[in-house]
Amino acid sequence: MGENDDGCSTQLIDGNGEFNVKGLDNFVKKTKLSDCGLSYAVVAIMGPQSSGKSTLLNHLFKTSFREMDAFAGRSQTTKGIWMARCVGIEPFTIAMDLEGTDGRERGEDDTTFEKQSALFAIAVADIVLINMWCHDIGREQAANKPLLKTVFQVMLRLFSPRKTTLLFVIRDKTKTPIELLERALREDIQKIWDSVRKPEAHKNTPLNEFFNVMIVALSSYEEKEKQFEQEVAELRQRFFHSISPGGLAGDRRGVVPASGFSFSSQQIWKVIKENRDLDLPAHKVMVATVRCEEIANEKLRDLATNESWLELHEAAEGGLVPGFGKKLSSILEKYFSEYDAEAIYFDEGVRKEKRLQLKLNALDFVYPSYATMLGHLRSNALESFKIRLEQSLNQGEGFAKAVRDSQQSCLMVFDKGCEDAAVKQATWDASKIREKLCRDIDAHTFFARSAKLSELTANYEKRLTQALSEPVESLFEAGGKETWPSIRKLLKRETETAVTDFLDVVTGFELDHAKIDAMVQNLKNYSQSLVEKKAREEAAKILIRMKDRFSTVFSHDKDSMPRVWTGKEDIRAITKDARAEALSLLSVMTAIRLDERPDNIESTLFSSLMDGTVSAASSHNRSVGTSTDPLASSSWEEVPPNNILLTPVQCKSLWRQFKSETEYTVTQAISAQEAHKRNNNWLPPAWAIVLMIVLGFNEFMMLLKNPLYLLGFFVAFLLSKALWVQLDIPREFQHGAVAGVLSITSKFLPTVMNLLRKLAEEAQGKTTQEVPDLSASQTYRQQSPSHSISSTISESVASNISSAGDDAEYSSPSPALVRRRNTNNVQESEISQM
């Protein structure tokens, strides 16, 4: 018996009870049984050996099971269980040809396989044809009655109720009415059912709960072949749509889907052979579990290799994917739908359970991509928040409002992105990612607020530095009684202005009052510390400042003109005033006075250092042995220690150093004054003047008696005066007598020669007086009020004498040059006489 192209006849179980797994799989593959779902039926036939079972199946379903050759004798033809597809029957119907019972080949005692195959047929088939001879009805051992009894009993023990149609085919019917035969047969079957020992759960269960009993009679195939074929054809029609309501198996239960038929058959045969306790529903669940799990795993593998999924996954790794949720939902729905289509006929509970497991596994598989998308959304939203916040702040918007608006906008975009990325089949919650985004936004807000406040504070500190540093330094350099009041006023004004502006700006941050008050106080403390720092810096340079102050007062007069020590100045008084100014500056820099607290530092310093108290007290203390020096202390009365810049001891030491370093300046001034007196003393001693008057009385009288002598002396006086002015004799002698004589000697001869040449030219009338010369003459007369004589000779001399003090010129200079030199020399002469 082999396979043909139409029915694909295959041996399912061989005579030794070995299940042909490979053959069954080939059968399922060739016939495409797995595509049928629940739309298939299984028909099995059982009966005595050589009773025409294969012949009936071949005629009934157009199969090609091997039939017995009557001419070769009666022997076993079908060994084991064979199966084939029924040709031309809808729905898909499988015919199973079982090995005949009561065969001599197995013997009387070897009935195990008969019982196993019969039980297998009832457990697997929807319709079981029981082939029996008409004349065996009513016999106890015939008609498979013992076999049916055993099968019923074992089936109740191993399987739960499964509605099966038992179609008794009475062969070679006789003249006995079919009604009588049917009644007798039903009575026999009922007796068999009643005699079966049933489990407690089915003790009162009627036969029709498990079986549909039907009876049909056929004529003899050998004697009435045509009639037999006609009756078989009529019976064949009953197998069309056999599983539809009203069909032969219309009320069947516990049907295994076609895709699980192979596995189910294997497991049933395994249970029967091992005789393990198992009911049909459990078997059904087992088959559904295995098959649904296989389908689910297959769909999961297909999902993992799906090109659309791989492209979507790769795109999600690179960045945001618009429509991610819809695309992924579509991919998942495709495989979930395929699972539903393939597992629709399996046990509903198992199917749903495995579908849920498939769903969970599939969602777990794709979740990393979803999480990546949420990560991109979070990163983009955070970056967008940063950019939007910075833009809002640059546009001058308040910090708190900018944060709220930026956060609201970014969270809205994030929520929309989450909706776009949401997978329909999943219930994933993006709230944790959103919370993390909010935490990230809060963290960035905190750092941004801190940075902005630090920047704002730094700007206002810089502003205070610019507003206070130079003015405070200038006030300290001025160093007077109004120094600290001016500093306090400046500090208060600039601090209040900065605080007011700071409050206007910081209001946009919406900080609590305590925080704002602390920041304002820090700003005030900064301005005060800035002044204190400047004060300490200036205190460190106080000695230099004191010397500068002393030098300024000592070396300049009230009009800030440099002093010329002519011998008329009171150096002692000037020195005292200069030291008083320096000491006043020292008293200003001894302590920080920002709290307007009165002190006696200045009076103590003046009384101790200017009035000589220190030196006097020191002398007295050395004799008495006690200390009453007010500066012998490390602190000032009524001055906090942290406000002290210079201690009394330091002030005393600085004053000594100051006096020591300024004594040289005073000494130099005294020396310059004495030298000036010596250089400017032109008059002879008084005794010499008296002697000259006494001895020169006769000559004086002679001059009075002779006017020509007087005129000659007058001309000589004018010439001498001209030479005096041109040679600038007082200035020359400021550098010493020897140097003055040498300088005048070198200039005297050129000046005299130039003067004589001019006089000669005037006498000969070759030179004409010009307006600029008159102007020069007038300028000279104005600058020499002590000599206002309007003599022609004096004007000529004053306008034409050219100075040769520096370049020793012998040529006559131009009138303008002569006028300029005359003017300069007259001014220098006046300055030297101050």
Swiss-Prot record:
Listed EC numbers: 3.6.5.-
Lumenal membrane side: 705-707
Subcellular location: Endoplasmic reticulum membrane
Disordered as annotated region, ranges: 767-834
Entry keywords, A to Z: Coiled coil, Endoplasmic reticulum, GTP-binding, Hydrolase, Membrane, Nucleotide-binding, Transmembrane, Transmembrane helix
Biased composition, class Polar residues, residue ranges: 767-783, 823-834
Tree of life domain: Eukaryota
UniProt GO MF annotations: GTP binding; GTPase activity
Broad enzyme group: hydrolase
Membrane topology reported for the UniProt record: Multi-pass membrane protein
Residue ranges of every copy of the GB1/RHD3-type G domain listed in the record: 37-252
Tissue expression: Expressed in roots, leaves, stems and flowers.
Binding positions for GTP per the UniProt entry: G47, P48, Q49, S50, S51, G52, K53, S54
Start-end of Low complexity biased regions: 784-803
GO cellular component, one term: endoplasmic reticulum membrane
Coiled coil regions, renumbered to chain: 214-241
Transmembrane parts of this sequence: 684-704, 708-728
Cytoplasmic topological segments: 1-683, 729-834
UniProt xrefs under PANTHER family: PROTEIN ROOT HAIR DEFECTIVE 3 HOMOLOG 2 (PTHR45923:SF20), PROTEIN SEY1 (PTHR45923)
Function noted in UniProt: Probable GTP-binding protein that may be involved in cell development.
HAMAP family hit by this protein: Sey1
Family of this protein: Belongs to the TRAFAC class dynamin-like GTPase superfamily. GB1/RHD3 GTPase family. RHD3 subfamily.
Protein name: Protein ROOT HAIR DEFECTIVE 3 homolog 2
